[in-house]
Amino acid sequence: MILPTIAIIGRPNVGKSTLVNRLCQSNDAIVFDKPGVTRDRTYQNASWGGKEFQIVDTGGLVFDDDSEFLPEIRTQVFLALEEASLALLVVDGNQGVTDGDLSIAKWLRNSSCKTIVAVNKCESTTLGISLASEFWKLGLGEPNPVSAIHGSGTGDLLDLVIGELPENNIQDDEEKIMMSIIGRPNVGKSSLLNSICGEKRAIVSDISGTTTDSIDTLIKKGDNHWKIIDTAGIRRKKNVKYGTEFFGINRAFKSIDRSDVCVLVIDAIDGVTDQDQKLAGRIEEQGRACIIVVNKWDLVEKNSSTIYQVEKELRSKLYFLHWSKMIFISALTGQRVDNIFEHALNAVNQHRRRVTTSVVNEVLKESISWKSPPTKRSGKQGRLYYGTQVKNKPPTFTLFVNDPKLFGITYRRYIEKQIRVNLGFEGTPLILLWRGKQQRALNKEVERENIELIQKD
């Protein structure tokens, strides 16, 4: 089951994200002393008193201003409240009650959601009680003084929170498939997330950099539960200023690290850029499963051969991910969006797959029968004794040979291709470890494991 949700709501810059990080004991919400840092609604898991729940951080709520992203942020806050079991209204104790606080309180009183008031920036316990008392006038019950920075009062606040939450059954992240949506700014990542979820889950704008957090969304497709991470667009380092975008990009790279599968989004109009290639390299370096999604395909003028020509051109520049499935979609119209889950699931399954040693050696034996290991000018020839899979995520194989130096890059690529093609490894990188060992040192090992050597000295 999806965990019960607490929606963090309040005016801009009252310390909502700092409080989220304190309650969740993490730094996943971007904290920066500037109003409007949080735009989308972002989710984190937390636990207290034996209960686990989900906290959703929302953007600063303003009712009387329609500039910049404020209308879109309002929509995100409304959606967060609709799915919440409890609302936590955060106010600034130093500023006292403002017109903005009163407007939000009136809106919350008219909703059906239970609300707890957290009076933030009450660093002094004695003064905090005095500052908090002013917020009785919001009409939402007893105000609770806390300090998000120092942590004071947050334990009592969490006691109140869990007392209002329903019982829940917990599904661990280990049971979910973690899928991150990766790409440059404005390639349509948030539009894709919205299309996948069937709702306006992330703010969509033609302005680059709209998403500054990594956004986690839970969704069920068939028998599988997915956690989808929409990341901030990743730019060249020289174009990144210190601030929220800097933190967001670092968060996006961390999203790659915690993913089971990455969806690399490419703009069909712009094609592959240098930054796309760097992202592809990053995914390959981290050993993640991946599918390539070419978005905005509806905007391309095409004939019967266009898709083949475009795929060939894109693949020539994304050679890091030559093993990835490529899908041409339109996040705007929904064209082929549902195919993403099918191919992503296949990539994850291949990424987690294990193959028996006997099967690996059948493939290797067949491969060298078609193309023998190279022979040096000195007359010394490479010998491949046997291979075995030593781990998965990604599939990693150790190949025992007489001398790794005798196996050049061309032959190594040939063997990798044979393993991939014959065993059906699509959507995942493969790692081949070439280990030099004398045959006599292997004899006891292969006898114990009942392995037949492919080649002998």
Curated annotation (Swiss-Prot):
Gene Ontology terms describing biological process: ribosome biogenesis
Gene3D superfamilies according to UniProt: 3.30.300.20, P-loop containing nucleotide triphosphate hydrolases
Domain EngA-type G: 4-169, 177-352
Keywords: GTP-binding, Nucleotide-binding, Repeat, Ribosome biogenesis
Pfam family name, one: KH_dom-like
GO molecular function per UniProt: GTP binding; ribosome binding
Positions contributing to GTP 2 binding: 183-190, 230-234, 295-298
Binding site for GTP 1: 10-17, 57-61, 120-123
Transmembrane segments: none
Residue ranges annotated for the KH-like domain, each copy included: 353-438
NCBIfam families in UniProt: GTPase_EngA, small_GTP
Reported function: GTPase that plays an essential role in the late steps of ribosome biogenesis.
Family assignment from sequence similarity: Belongs to the TRAFAC class TrmE-Era-EngA-EngB-Septin-like GTPase superfamily. EngA (Der) GTPase family.
Description of how the protein assembles with itself and partners: Associates with the 50S ribosomal subunit.
Protein name as it appears in the record: GTPase Der
Lineage start: Bacteria, Bacillati, Cyanobacteriota, Cyanophyceae, Synechococcales
